């Protein structure tokens, strides 16, 4: 095994599309209490006014429920839902085809909106502000601009890289909403609900064990639940207990903090090859044979949230918690006393 277990990666996999396990309303949705409370107000206000809800931007690490919240918004607004992604919208005509087919007050969800091409983004501006499309017809001296009126709609954008959004695009979202990692208690509720939906008997200690190792991410919690249920059915009596959960997750390479082989390789690399850092992100990515984006978007957010690493102007450094977790003695060289003393 040379790379991290995809079970613990927060990117969407085909099995994550099981809609039966997804909450269907804000009432069912667990976690993100502040975001849910605000969305409930904005949704109710839009319904009372009979207008499209303001454009909304969800940002934060992957797997926290951006797509699910967008679908719930459309359902509670009582309107249609269309879904696409930034890389799919390669040219203005792709976006125009979607926008011109929206019904009044529909929700259009664009995942990975930070990956929109500049030419498509330019077409999106008047659509967001004036509900109109300005398209250039023809070429050269004969070219002319044609304005097409659109039905009022709500754009919901989702991004894991808020800093990559251009300022003009970011400023056109009236409701920017950051999604946070989930608490262990919240994930426990999600796992227990998932087990019930799957028709699996579970012990509180069993669901808690999965929640503890799910990296604060519901998508990962759902994946781990499915794998533990597999072990419970094949190697147990079908009941999700703490013992079967611990055995299954340990065999999957998931430790008690939720770190997998990829995370431990990252920490081990900095500890053993670079004395705990600082070391540049490009060096880390090259040594792990990963892209810089993969390291910054997939591996580092949870390590930062857990206080295992530090980002400094000179590069990444291990925090004392990382040394302790890996069972490695930190170096006693110059400059280490403040961090590890």
Curated annotation (Swiss-Prot):
Residues reported in the UniProt entry to bind DNA: 292, 311, 316
Any one GO biological process: DNA repair
CDD domains in the record: AAA
Main location: cytoplasm
Binding site for Mg(2+): 67
Keyword DNA damage attached: yes
Location of the protein in the cell: Cytoplasm
Binding-site list for ATP: 21-22, 63, 66-68, 129-131, 172, 182, 219
Region annotated Small ATPAse domain (RuvB-S), chain positions: 183-253
InterPro entries listed in its UniProt record: AAA+_ATPase, AAA_lid_4, DNA_helicase_Holl-junc_RuvB, P-loop_NTPase, RuvB-like_N, RuvB_C, WH-like_DNA-bd_sf, WH_DNA-bd_sf
Catalytic reaction annotation: ATP + H2O = ADP + phosphate + H(+)
GO function terms (MF aspect): ATP binding; ATP hydrolysis activity; four-way junction DNA binding; four-way junction helicase activity
Family from the record: Belongs to the RuvB family.
Record's comment describing the protein's domains: Has 3 domains, the large (RuvB-L) and small ATPase (RuvB-S) domains and the C-terminal head (RuvB-H) domain. The head domain binds DNA, while the ATPase domains jointly bind ATP, ADP or are empty depending on the state of the subunit in the translocation cycle. During a single DNA translocation step the structure of each domain remains the same, but their relative positions change.
Role: The RuvA-RuvB-RuvC complex processes Holliday junction (HJ) DNA during genetic recombination and DNA repair, while the RuvA-RuvB complex plays an important role in the rescue of blocked DNA replication forks via replication fork reversal (RFR). RuvA specifically binds to HJ cruciform DNA, conferring on it an open structure. The RuvB hexamer acts as an ATP-dependent pump, pulling dsDNA into and through the RuvAB complex. RuvB forms 2 homohexamers on either side of HJ DNA bound by 1 or 2 RuvA tetramers; 4 subunits per hexamer contact DNA at a time.
Protein's recorded name: Holliday junction branch migration complex subunit RuvB
């Amino acid at each position: 095994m040379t790379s991290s277990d995809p079970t613990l990666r927060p990117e969407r996999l085909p099995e994550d599309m099981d809609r039966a396990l997804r909450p269907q309303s804000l009432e069912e949705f667990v976690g993100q209490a502040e975001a849910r409370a605000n969305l409930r107000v904005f949704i109710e206000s839009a319904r009372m006014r009979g207008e499209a809800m303001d454009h909304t931007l969800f940002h934060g690490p992957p797997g926290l429920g951006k797509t699910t919240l967008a679908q719930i918004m459309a359902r509670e607004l009582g309107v249609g839902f269309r879904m696409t992604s930034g890389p799919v919208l390669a040219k203005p005509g792709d976006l125009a085809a979607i926008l011109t087919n929206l019904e009044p007050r529909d929700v259009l969800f664009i995942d990975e909106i930070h990956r929109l091409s500049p030419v498509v983004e330019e077409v999106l501006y008047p659509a967001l502000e004036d509900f109109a499309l300005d398209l250039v017809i023809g070429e050269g001296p004969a070219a002319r601009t044609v304005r097409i009126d659109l039905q009022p709609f709500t754009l919901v954008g989702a991004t894991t890289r808020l800093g990559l959004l251009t300022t003009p695009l970011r400023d056109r979202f009236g409701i920017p909403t950051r999604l946070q990692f989930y608490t262990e208690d919240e994930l426990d509720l999600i796992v227990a609900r998932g087990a019930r939906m799957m028709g699996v008997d579970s012990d509180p200690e069993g669901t808690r064990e999965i929640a503890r190792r799910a990296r604060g991410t519901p998508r990962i919690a759902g994946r781990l639940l499915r794998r533990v249920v597999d072990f419970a059915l094949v190697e147990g009596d079908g009941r999700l207990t703490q013992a079967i959960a611990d055995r299954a997750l340990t065999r999957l390479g998931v430790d008690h903090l939720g770190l997998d082989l990829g995370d431990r390789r990252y920490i081990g690399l900095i500890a053993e090859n670079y004395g705990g850092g600082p070391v540049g992100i490009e060096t880390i990515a090259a040594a792990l044979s990963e892209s810089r984006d993969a390291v910054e978007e997939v591996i580092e957010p949870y390590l930062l949230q857990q206080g295992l690493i530090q980002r400094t102007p000179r590069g990444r450094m291990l925090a004392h918690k990382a040394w302790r977790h890996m069972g490695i003695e930190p170096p006693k060289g110059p400059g280490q006393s403040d961090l590890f003393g």
